[in-house]
UniProtKB/Swiss-Prot annotation:
It is found in: Cytoplasm. It comes from Geobacillus kaustophilus (strain HTA426). CDD domains: TrmD-like. This is tRNA (guanine-N(1)-)-methyltransferase. It catalyses: guanosine(37) in tRNA + S-adenosyl-L-methionine = N(1)-methylguanosine(37) in tRNA + S-adenosyl-L-homocysteine + H(+). One of its GO terms (molecular function) is tRNA (guanine(37)-N1)-methyltransferase activity. Belongs to the RNA methyltransferase TrmD family. It comes from the Bacteria. Specifically methylates guanosine-37 in various tRNAs. GO terms for cellular component: cytosol. One of its GO terms (biological process) is tRNA N1-guanine methylation.
Amino acid sequence: MRIDILTLFPGMFSGVLSESILKKAQEKGAVDIRLIDFREFADNKHKTVDDYPYGGGAGMVLKPQPIFDAVEHVTAGSPGARIILLCPQGERYTQKKAEELAKETHLVLICGHYEGYDERIRQYLATDEISIGDYILTGGELGAMVIVDSVVRLLPGVLGNEASPVDDSFSSGLLEYPQYTRPADFRGMKVPDILLSGNHQLIAEWREKESLRRTFLRRPDLLDEYPLTDKQKQWLKEWEKERE
């Protein structure tokens, strides 16, 4: 996979891309991540990328020309690239979206700044608009980091344990079950006996139940569209009674 990040502040990414999973993924050749300062594509003497909004109003708006030219440059020979605007008006980012993007071969992430984008960028250039949450950030860089991390870890061969991304919270549609490691008894706080039993069938059922319980207690909204089994429906009824 290739990921191009269009930003006015490429230095913000140096630490993120040179550590942990993202560093290893690049070293393995699983992903090619490139930083593009789209100010370099401005066609004016002072390399200005923003201007006052027509009709008046507060703030400055990103001009279409530098972004159009930068995108056309990085997508030359790659007509199927996904062009993604990071903006608060976009679709709420989810694990499902990460899994969708992980199937692509070329992503272009555009990090906004100032008051926003010229609308023609949205209308005629972007294929997607994504928001990472209902809050305002200084720019799209942090959102781009979130997308890159969540997508790259899903690429084949990036994580050591191929089951790891599948077991993560949200991948199954539910929150992840509780995890424990050594020691089995820490200051009187003990690991559940069933996890020490060696009975894989019982452990699998415990994890399924605890995953559902945690989702029920913390994110019940995730259950609205989750395909519950009869057994899981029975568990939910029991927990509902306990709360009455």
